[in-house]
């Protein structure tokens, strides 16, 4: 294997620290071709789909990539903005907000970049940019508060894969999760409290997290437990009693059992249980995206209303709210200790 290296090391800057903020990713456009490229990269990740590669190759290329891109493109069109994909727009705004907060304290010694695990800007391209700037110390923050091998673990894989091709490795701090980080919990509580003060409360507040196959839990993935940990801390911060809130899991894919209760099934059943109004918040999504804007605010709204529900409200993600950016910047700063003078 040929390792990448540079003959001239005079450009190395021992003072500077690179901060890489990452999220899942998004297609370049809400079009079939762009969706096919994005889904191929996403669904080819063995962390995401843990079945034998030989079998999955045929399922992916002969079935999923033939059928799903067109349908997914239509869904993305419903949430696409003039600026582009909501996830990328908000992620870039988050990166800028974190940069401003850190540079106000540390100046140009901290360089912040944003990358996507799948799609653009890629993790590899941003790591290369850090290397080109002579940066030898890195902090990586995946914006998945609750750890799962399919998200946080996959992000580490991508970083490690890039490092495997290098001759000179940087110092690395990888923030693997933050499900109980007090500033994160407080930012969410303030956000929900402000929404409810303006719009009123509902019979039930539902915390909906992205689901994963149940077998991930059975094999030792802590995601299920960390989601419940976040929910419990958030409910406590809001002063909610047990009957006022619940945790559900959305976005299941395929025929196997995923973490339950399912969000869509819950929305269909709540009206029959006497719940006439519901508010949904997604603590695991740091930015609004297809899964929140289309799946929750559109699809699950329909499920609830068609089942007899009277009032459905989606409470937006924290996105680039100041309290959220303060929390993320503080989380990064906590991990800069020893990296800066």
Curated annotation (Swiss-Prot):
Its EC number is 4.98.1.1. It catalyses: heme b + 2 H(+) = protoporphyrin IX + Fe(2+). CDD domains: Ferrochelatase_C, Ferrochelatase_N. GO terms for molecular function: ferrochelatase activity; metal ion binding. Pathway: Porphyrin-containing compound metabolism; protoheme biosynthesis; protoheme from protoporphyrin-IX: step 1/1. Catalyzes the ferrous insertion into protoporphyrin IX. Belongs to the ferrochelatase family. This is Ferrochelatase. It comes from Alcanivorax borkumensis (strain ATCC 700651 / DSM 11573 / NCIMB 13689 / SK2). The gene is hemH.
């Amino acid at each position: 294997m040929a390792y990448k290296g540079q003959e001239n090391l005079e450009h190395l800057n021992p003072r500077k620290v690179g901060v890489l903020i990452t999220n899942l990713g998004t297609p370049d456009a809400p079009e079939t071709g762009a969706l096919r490229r994005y889904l191929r990269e996403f669904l080819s990740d063995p962390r995401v789909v843990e079945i034998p590669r030989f079998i999955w190759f045929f399922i992916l290329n002969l079935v999923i990539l033939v059928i799903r891109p067109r349908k997914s493109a239509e869904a993305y069109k419903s949430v696409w903005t003039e600026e582009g994909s909501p996830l990328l727009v908000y992620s870039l705004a988050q990166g800028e907000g974190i940069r401003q907060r850190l540079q106000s304290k540390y100046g140009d010694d901290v360089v912040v970049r944003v990358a996507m695990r799948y799609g653009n800007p890629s993790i590899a391209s941003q790591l290369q940019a850090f290397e080109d700037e002579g940066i030898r110390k890195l902090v990586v923050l995946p914006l998945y508060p609750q750890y799962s091998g399919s998200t946080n673990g996959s992000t580490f894989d991508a970083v490690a894969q890039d490092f495997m091709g290098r001759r000179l490795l940087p110092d690395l701090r990888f923030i693997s999760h933050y499900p109980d980080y007090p500033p994160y919990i407080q930012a969410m509580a303030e956000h929900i409290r402000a929404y409810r003060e303006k719009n009123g409360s509902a019979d039930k507040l539902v915390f909906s997290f992205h689901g994963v196959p149940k077998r991930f839990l059975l094999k030792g993935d802590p995601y299920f437990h960390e989601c419940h940990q976040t929910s419990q801390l958030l409910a406590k911060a809001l002063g909610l009693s047990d009957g006022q809130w619940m945790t559900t899991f959305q976005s299941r894919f395929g025929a196997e059992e995923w973490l339950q209760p399912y969000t869509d099934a819950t929305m269909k059943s709540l009206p029959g249980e006497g719940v006439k109004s519901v508010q949904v918040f997604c603590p695991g999504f740091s930015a609004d995206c297809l899964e929140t804007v289309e799946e929750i605010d559109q699809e699950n709204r329909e499920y609830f209303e068609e089942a007899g529900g009277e009032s459905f409200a989606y409470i937006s993600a924290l996105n680039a709210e100041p309290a959220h950016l303060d929390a993320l910047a503080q989380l990064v700063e906590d991990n800069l200790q020893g990296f800066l003078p």
